[in-house]
Amino acid sequence: MERMSAPHALTLLLTACVAFSTQAQTTNVRLDVWDGKGYQPCEPSIAMHPNNPDVVVAGSILDNVYRSEDGGQSWMKDKLTSPLGVFGDPCVVASPTGDFYFLHLSDPEGMGWRSEALLDRIVCQRSTNGGKSWSKGGGMGHTPPKDQDKEWAVVNHDGSRIHACWTQFDAYGSEEPGDSTTILCSFANAKGKKWSAPVRVSDKAGDCIDSDDTAEGAVPAVGVNGEIVVAWALGPWIYFDKSVDGGQTWGEDRIVADIAGGWDQTIPGIGRVNGMPVTCVDTSNGPHRGRIYINWTDTRNGDTDVWLTHSDDGGETWSTTRRVNTDGADRDQFFTWMTVDPVRGDVHVVFYDRRHNDTREDRSTHVVVASSTDGGDSWTNRTVSETPFTPEGKLFFGDYNNITAVDGHVRPIWTREELGVLSVWTALLDLP
């Protein structure tokens, strides 16, 4: 096990970068950096103990797991193992009881892309001690030769059940018109070992190419009455559905927003960028309790921007789409993720930001956390990266970042590139 400490806190000067967003007094902490062996770390995920913000657990590609006992100031790194294999798409979520779950893709033969069994199921592993140790894991969606991909999960309010949703590919990457993708969901008790038979959620199927016309981006959330809600992207639309019986059955899909240009977006220095939706619910006792939020990126204004819509009636009707980034036109913001503070009800969105550049082609990239205390009506954009980075566009950079927040303790997590080497970082953002 490897321990990495926070770098010395830097005093952030009010320089020209303040002109494009509020400069948060944050310290950046590195969780990991590629050591030259195996896969480079990316696609980070992070979760905070709901009753003890000092305990934070994170993960990254391919099988990295990190834990902190001081609110993210220092981290211990380990490798996650499972008899079912560990092959990326890390999803770390916390239970109201303080358990943590790490969901990921499977590699039961340990041969990676050389194995026909790769991606044959979604795997869930549980930790009851803050990420120090993990269960062997339980699988869901095992229907070979179909491939299971792009999963995310949420735990219900009393911690008794975990729900997961993902995309099933008839054959990943296939261009055959008869091959399709669907959104599936399953659930298990708190142990996360035995999962229910998957239920199809998406009424309309997508193709298997893994692009705009593929059904992807299912991030479930739990409503205040225990309903399960989820949105995903397919073609130029964001679809929404919900279950009111604990995930056993689902309703008719609703189109709730357009995702102009599709979810498969292109950014200089990165290549393909995922603009898929993220779904959250305000479960606090604040004025917007029960509000469902959906967050995504698209190119409706020509450049890539971060967007949000919300519903106060269980998904029946949706608000006018609002832009989260507060800059002018013709600069890109991308790789968005959202969380809602379960204590305060504040909405926090993390994304990469290039508003400080002279031209849209410039690749210098900052990290911004946008926060709303009024239900998404207005936004404060804070630059949380101490310095920008400039990606070269030659590496697999991953498909997402992540963010967690409890009672004003906000921890974004992101990937950074320096001279062809990837590293994973967080920022210690503690709001009054």
Language-model features: locations:
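N-terminal secretory signal peptides that target proteins for export/translocation
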Residues: 1-7
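Bacterial N-terminal signal peptides
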Residues: 8-21
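Extracellular, repeat-based ectodomains that mediate carbohydrate processing or recognition
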Residues: 25-432
